[in-house]
Amino acid sequence: MSQTGSHPGRGLAGRWLWGAQPCLLLPIVPLSWLVWLLLLLLASLLPSARLASPLPREEEIVFPEKLNGSVLPGSGAPARLLCRLQAFGETLLLELEHDSGVQVEGLTVQYLGQAPELLGGAEPGTYLTGTINGEPESVASLHWDGGALLGVLQYRGAELHLQPLEGGTPNSAGGPGAHILRRKSPASGQGPMCNVKAPLGSPSPRPRRAKRFASLSRFVETLVVADDKMAAFHGAGLKRYLLTVMAAAAKAFKHPSIRNPVSLVVTRLVILGSGEEGPQVGPSAAQTLRSFCAWQRGLNTPEDSDPDHFDTAILFTRQDLCGVSTCDTLGMADVGTVCDPARSCAIVEDDGLQSAYTAAHELGHVFNMLHDNSKPCISLNGPLSTSRHVMAPVMAHVDPEEPWSPCSARFITDFLDNGYGHCLLDKPEAPLHLPVTFPGKDYDADRQCQLTFGPDSRHCPQLPPPCAALWCSGHLNGHAMCQTKHSPWADGTPCGPAQACMGGRCLHMDQLQDFNIPQAGGWGPWGPWGDCSRTCGGGVQFSSRDCTRPVPRNGGKYCEGRRTRFRSCNTEDCPTGSVLTFREEQCAAYNHCTDLFKSFPGPMDWVPRYTGVAPQDQCKLTCQARALGYYYVLEPRVVDGTPCSPDSSSVCVQGRCIHAGCDRIIGSKKKFDKCMVCGGDGSGCSKQSGSFRKFRYGYNNVVTIPTGATHILVRQQGNPGHRSIYLALKLPDGSYALNGEYTLMPSPTDVVLPGAISLRYSGATAASETLSGHGPLAQPLTLQVLVAGNPQDARLRYSFFVPRPTPSTPHPTPQDWLHRRAQILEILRRRPWVGRK
């Protein structure tokens, strides 16, 4: 998918394209030269241009017969099931029991509209395991959907795949309950390339603020929706297929490379029929996403604690999705919207089992992840490849050892640390246990080809190496050929005698046990303290630890708890020669960036903007162009250690305002008193207050606020509809800092004064005109009022604190010295002599 937009914030669309290398015979990307060469060679060897036969297999239409069984209390799902079928000249008796390991607990399944191919088996279904003909070495693993069986049988060295035919409905081959049973023998390693087998004649069914810098369990309660095209294509196997895809996506989110404990939980499954007025699904991916996002909100409940509530929704469709100029899009989602009920949604074009990575990719966008080729990611990922991770813009194969790039891990961590994942902290009461078997056990290579390229496609064997890329049969201009989308075989797909695929490699069955046992992670030691973010004035330094002792494996639990700690450093005052505050320096760094305003020539004077900035945005670098008055967020974060505001001693740490004392120590309880003395008792200053009512036209002097004044507050009240007086500030040199030259500032603003001091002004049009600031002033200010009319009912009051004069010690006069001398002599005369006999 290609992401549109350039800002990492919420609201941008993300799209994904499969096939970093060419995808053959598909409109997504052009044909590979290697396959064209293969076709030419085959055409020269085979006059008919038909490729040779694939792996040996046999197929039969069978009619499973339910003999007896019992149901689970309160659910209606079978606890035991005895089933018989005739195949390959033999009677197979399946003795099945309910498998609690893949029980679908807490899953709500809804069928909306008319979908006759599904309604015959619309019960939620259950998973059954057992034996065949009582032989202990045999294995039956099936999904029972009320009238259809789907799964794998392993019997006497053969592997048999059982699935409903035409959704279990009547067809030309037999009566109700018709299934197809395919017997597949192990690959012999010999034989011709492959052959395009005749088609079977029908498609095969198929919160709010979390602790900062802490690793907390997140549960993404997900609504999964399948449209009518999905129902028509997959038939009775749709539900099992969706759960298999979501299980693979959930497995990706469990990988430790994401550096967060994220659990993808499917809580509701909705299947749409042709008669349902659902979302408008069409070729335009953007319009489909907008329609689905609006539609899914109507299914949600507002309370996060409600069992029917979901945190995000994902739509699967067989519709070919298109972007602005091409139809390369396989999915789309808004960025950074996971807890926004109106926009936490994604769409996925079903493309076979690899759709699990499309779903993971789109949900990655919902978690604020960017594409790995974006500018921020290139700097974070370093020289790593941008095409081997889940968030690659165009991808052929996900690295099983590191599916998430460092950039993806960084963005989701920052996103959650900043409180955007508050809705994910509640643990579902009845979690859904997704299928635990490897998908390749339920969907062999032939089935994977059908899911990807259509019902007529089959696996092309003996194209080395096995497991690395799935090659499937197809036709081009009437000629048989093999094609691939470069995705690996699904994990668990048989690839040889007693061998199966895992992570794109063909391994012995004994080695697969290493991938079945979950291993929880453990924290490693704390690392050393890093560099201080400031050289003076109070900086921040960090120390972190990783979940590496051991690293979690196979879906094992990721470490929980504090992963990063921080402390204050370099808290001493900066040199007195510093003219700008730390935030002013950061704004001034953009003064020579002329590309921000194309029509404004020359450098710009950027100053911090405090007024009108929401509390949650205090740690963004919001600066105002002094000449134009416009203000912008120039950086998503200020440098660590920057004060959150002029009126606070708290400091910004990784984009969050963290409490600090006036001594610049994070966590300290020291406060400024009214005199702006750190830890003082307020005795060093006195309050000065007064009012003013002698209004005359023009500028009127009210009071001179002296140097060192603190906690300044000026309030002017009157009839806002007929106001005729306004506050003004005059500097010692005669210039005006506010509302001079009969020019008013109508909106709220920060009045920047010499000495890196600022006062907050409400604006001339405010209902109550105010001017306030903590100080202390570096030079005196003259408070004035500008009278522009009849000042009826106008009232002005002011107050501030001024330092108390230090009492001077008078020099003693000669008389004082004589008096003190007499007192000392009298004391000495009265004392007894030490040692007198």
UniProtKB/Swiss-Prot annotation:
Cofactor binding summary note: Binds 1 zinc ion per subunit.
Disulfide bonds: 293-345, 322-327, 339-423, 377-407, 449-472, 460-482, 467-501, 495-506, 532-569, 536-574, 547-559
Cofactor needs: Zn(2+)
Enzyme category, top tier: hydrolase
Residues binding Zn(2+): 194, 361, 365, 371
Active-site annotation: 362
Entry PTM: The precursor is cleaved by a furin endopeptidase. Glycosylated. Can be O-fucosylated by POFUT2 on a serine or a threonine residue found within the consensus sequence C1-X(2)-(S/T)-C2-G of the TSP type-1 repeat domains where C1 and C2 are the first and second cysteine residue of the repeat, respectively. Fucosylated repeats can then be further glycosylated by the addition of a beta-1,3-glucose residue by the glucosyltransferase, B3GALTL. Fucosylation mediates the efficient secretion of ADAMTS family members.
Reactions this protein catalyses: Glutamyl endopeptidase. Bonds cleaved include 370-Thr-Glu-Gly-Glu-|-Ala-Arg-Gly-Ser-377 in the interglobular domain of mammalian aggrecan
GO cellular component, one term: extracellular region
Record GO biological process: extracellular matrix organization; proteolysis
Domain TSP type-1: 520-575
Domain Disintegrin: 437-519
Stretch list, region Spacer: 686-837
Residue span of motif Cysteine switch: 192-199
Record's subcellular location: Secreted, Extracellular space, Extracellular matrix
Residues with attached carbohydrate: 68
EC number(s) on file: 3.4.24.82
Residue span, Peptidase M12B domain: 218-428
Signal peptide positions on this chain: 1-51
This protein's UniProt keywords: Cleavage on pair of basic residues, Disulfide bond, Extracellular matrix, Glycoprotein, Hydrolase, Metal-binding, Metalloprotease, Protease, Secreted, Signal, Zinc, Zymogen
Propeptide: 52-212
Function: Cleaves aggrecan, a cartilage proteoglycan, at the '392-Glu-|-Ala-393' site and may be involved in its turnover. Also cleaves COMP. May play an important role in the destruction of aggrecan in arthritic diseases.
Domain description: The spacer domain and the TSP type-1 domains are important for a tight interaction with the extracellular matrix. The spacer domain is also required for cleavage of COMP. The conserved cysteine present in the cysteine-switch motif binds the catalytic zinc ion, thus inhibiting the enzyme. The dissociation of the cysteine from the zinc ion upon the activation-peptide release activates the enzyme.
Known partners and oligomeric status: Interacts with SRPX2.
Protein name: A disintegrin and metalloproteinase with thrombospondin motifs 4
Gene: ADAMTS4
